Amino acid sequence: MLLRAAWRRAAVAVTAAPGPKPAAPTRGLRLRVGDHAPQSAVPADTAAAPEAGPVLRPLYMDVQATTPLDPRVLDAMLPYLINYYGNPHSRTHAYGWESEAAMERARQQVASLIGADPREIIFTSGATESNNIAIKGVARFYRSRKKHLITTQTEHKCVLDSCRSLEAEGFQVTYLPVQKSGIIDLKELEAAIQPDTSLVSVMTVNNEIGVKQPIAEIGRICSSRKVYFHTDAAQAVGKIPLDVNDMKIDLMSISGHKIYGPKGVGAIYIRRRPRVRVEALQSGGGQERGMRSGTVPTPLVVGLGAACEVAQQEMEYDHKRISKLSERLIQNIMKSLPDVVMNGDPEHHYPGCINLSFAYVEGESLLMALKDVALSSGSACTSASLEPSYVLRAIGTDEDLAHSSIRFGVGRFTTEEEVDYTVEKCIQHVKRLREMSPLWEMVQDGIDLKSIKWTQH
């Protein structure tokens, strides 16, 4: 159904005479799957058992893992999937010229969102590749003079693994601790910078606890010490205002699927003045100014550009709406359940990412109980691990609370009804699971669990 609808929409987009655009889908309305609905809990295709009728999917509350494709983004992409399929690097015919023009328009849209020059935007396959290019590319280019990097203990796994890879090559890496709030101590950052430090990499918004780092202050420190500053902004671009010049950011990683764009595409901002030099990670045709060889996927970058344009237009509205829904979720859970802890700084925090720990409840058990709501206990990249979140451990959360954490994601298409349903089910199952917990029973009897000396058998 979805494929047939896509072909019909593409044909209309390419062949229809000019006229007024159809109205965008109204926020909060349930749309049919064939209409490319981003909303959760919509009927799924039932080709395997059509007689069974529509199957309801869970409500989607995991927007830090990925976001649904905005229908307006899909509309922008469709012509380049069907009719305008030329290679944007083919300079001898109209097919290539059309795709190149679309690619450069997308580059402008991405640059406009972060206050950059379009020539400073390099398209990649996503934030993971962008982070690798930034960290490994800068470190290797300046390795003859500078062999030291600085990052934090709460970065995304791809940043931490890139740094560990560089350590194996002989580089030195300082992993800054964070405070209980999840925010770094700027004095510790200043003290960690050495004469041979080439790069500082600190993420803008944490993907697990939503904490916002003081990016502008970090940028000023790095600029004054003549050290390049990279930020992984996958969870921040399009959600909070960012300006690479005002914040003195030298490199920035961007992801398409975290801002209601397609998966498989991202970008890296690399400053031109003063120029940041980067060693390319892959060899090939020298596309993207030699920094990222490989044919640029026109439909995907068009989608990324459209997502950035929509985000720029609606950022203020989205932020107010998401803040209101997030506050509703937090307050309604906390007023109904005792012993609930919000992880991370509540003030310096992106409201769409809420990480709560429910004492005396195992997080995995709660996730299984909440089968009607799509949630996670942390980063999607490490969700298969049963170990407690390294981010929560870094902010000093004890192991039991770290194991009991759930991340709630509120996004552009989340409705008030979905928030209320999630709250209702969460309260219901936390109470049920606590009633089954001997630890909860002991606490209700007034026993201090910390005073008990446990023995192994």
Swiss-Prot record:
Q: Which Pfam families would you find in this protein's record? A: Aminotran_5
Which key words are in the record?
Cytoplasm, Cytoskeleton, Iron, Iron-sulfur, Metal-binding, Mitochondrion, Molybdenum cofactor biosynthesis, Nucleus, Pyridoxal phosphate, Transferase, Transit peptide, Zinc
Quote the InterPro entries the UniProt record gives.
Aminotrans_V_dom, Aminotrans_V_PyrdxlP_BS, Cys_deSase_IscS, Cysteine_dSase, PyrdxlP-dep_Trfase, PyrdxlP-dep_Trfase_major, PyrdxlP-dep_Trfase_small
Gene3D superfamilies registered for this protein in UniProt:
Aspartate Aminotransferase, domain 1, Type I PLP-dependent aspartate aminotransferase-like (Major domain)
In which family does this protein belong, per the annotation? Belongs to the class-V pyridoxal-phosphate-dependent aminotransferase family. NifS/IscS subfamily.
Where on the chain is N6-(pyridoxal phosphate)lysine found, per UniProt?
258
Q: Which organism is it from?
A: Pongo abelii
Q: Which cofactor does it need?
A: pyridoxal 5'-phosphate
E.C. number(s) listed in UniProt: 2.8.1.7
One GO term describing the cellular component: nucleus
> Where in the sequence is Cysteine persulfide found?
381
Q: Indicate what this protein is called per its UniProt record.
A: Cysteine desulfurase
Q: Which residues take part in binding pyridoxal 5'-phosphate?
A: 127-128, 235, 255, 257, 295
**Record's comment on post-translational modification:** N-gluconoylated. Cysteine persulfide intermediate is reduced by thiol-containing molecules like glutathione and L-cysteine. Persulfide reduction is a rate-limiting step of cysteine desulfurase catalytic cycle.
The answer, when asked if Iron is one of the entry's keywords, is yes
What would you give as a GO molecular function for this chain, any one?
A: iron-sulfur cluster binding
Q: Which residues bind Zn(2+)?
A: 381
